[in-house]
Amino acid sequence: MSEESGSFGGWFSSWFNTSKDQESSSNLIQQQQPGTNYARNQQTLSSLRSQKQQAESSKEDTRNSPGKLVRTDTESYLDAPKTQQANNNRKVTRRLPLTNNNLVIDCPIPDRLLGALNCTERDEFSQLRYTAATCEPDDFELEGYTLRPKIYNRETELFIEDEILFTRTMHGVMKNIAHLCSLKKNSVWGPDGWKKVVVCIVADGRKVVNKRVLNVLASMGIYQAGIAKNIVDNKPVKAHIYEYTTQISIDSDMNIKGSDKGIVPVQTIFCLKEKNAKKINSHRWFFNAFGPILQPNVCILLDVGTRPGNSSIYQLWKVFHRNPLIGGACGEIRAMLGTACCQLINPLVAAQNFEYKMSNILDKPLESVFGYISVLPGAFSAYRYAALKNDVSGQGPLEKYFLGEDLHKDQHTGKKAGLFEANMYLAEDRILCFELVAKKDERWLLQYVDSAFGETDVPSQLPEFISQRRRWLNGSFFAGVYGLIHFSKIWNSGHGFSRTFLLLIEGIYNVISLIFSWFSVVIVLSFLCT
């Protein structure tokens, strides 16, 4: 899990934090029957529900203390052997056939989970597909890897990504997919609309991923403990990929929802990276590894803990479907205010709520008229995959976007990035938006969709607020300067005269706004000094 996704808000911050005191000294992987694994995962969910109820009626310090959970296979799966004897006991040599020199295993799901499903006639419902990827994301397709939607020759209309799918986000996504399947008169969607949607979960690091999140995923059939391999054919594994079409959803109250509650099947890819490599690397797996295989029409990005509206994903997709020139879109970002807007009592939350509303009412609609939105928020945004792809020479929006990861790698190798680049790539999503609109010989536009919204947590404490804004201010300022310096790229794009003129007007507006932002910081600093 990346550092950017370390805080979740609400009671999740209490019950989903790792506690070293709960680690068992035993490091052996116990062989369990599938039904027993599922039962223990169910017991864990029941424990989580009871702990949440106790937390809601207790004081703040009690709510933030770690809860006592039932030990599951997921926990022992991540434990490393500390003694040579334990290590020897764990080793069981099995020879498995490779598929195109790659390790691919189809694992049956637990019997009790299988018995709770309505549709079981296809392998995607009865078997979890595991792939051990030993290559970098950019070489995923070239090394012969593939994905289930490609095997089934399914057209992927929507490709949805988020780093670690907590129940609040996942349940919201599954309700959106159920809404797509309810559109019986739509030419694209309908009862089988779920076959055109793939949900991708990218966990940033096997050792740091939250084990209780794995318990939830295991209860949905998306994950199984004990099948991951570290080395395949003397090559270290870079990522563990689990594919399953789940028919079960778990809401934020740890209640299981099935087809009787309107939940439809959802094609899911769970990519568990071996090492923590930050957010941009997770996006590299999403765009460069899985994207070329699935060839999706629209990619939707969701931040950790963001809950989309019940029809917001459809509202975003509809913009791309109606206008083939739309390369990116975003919806309204709303601050979670709690029951009866009680969070507004906190001045910090109230100020951020006002800021978000002003941005959604004034800034983004105005920029949408010109066709260029300075930033599509990563918490809830969508891109047309064809617009993001690089050209035959390897240059394009994604190439510029992933330079931020290369700068991060240079820091580990001793090479220092320049001051401008280091600050600019604190807001890499702004770079992506500019490069998309200024793409050579293309005329992609960005649009704001007010009918789509996503609710997200905002910092409620001053330290985390300052940390967030320091990153935003530095990144937005230097990314704005980058856009002005490279504004001449607009002349090489495929935009017509009228659109280029509108973009020129917006460029002048951005210059004035940048100057105002610079002097506003100086005024604030001088005020604080006095």
Swiss-Prot record:
Its EC number is 2.4.1.16. It comes from the Eukaryota. GO terms for biological process: cell wall organization; chitin biosynthetic process. Pfam families: Chitin_synth_1, Chitin_synth_1N. It is an enzyme of class 2 (transferase). SUPFAM superfamilies: Nucleotide-diphospho-sugar transferases. Optimum temperature is 15 to 40 degrees Celsius. Residues 24-56 have a biased composition (Polar residues). GO terms for molecular function: chitin synthase activity. The keyword Secreted does not apply. Polymerizes chitin, a structural polymer of the cell wall and septum, by transferring the sugar moiety of UDP-GlcNAc to the non-reducing end of the growing chitin polymer. PANTHER family: CHITIN SYNTHASE, CHITIN SYNTHASE 1. This is Chitin synthase 1. The gene is CHS1.
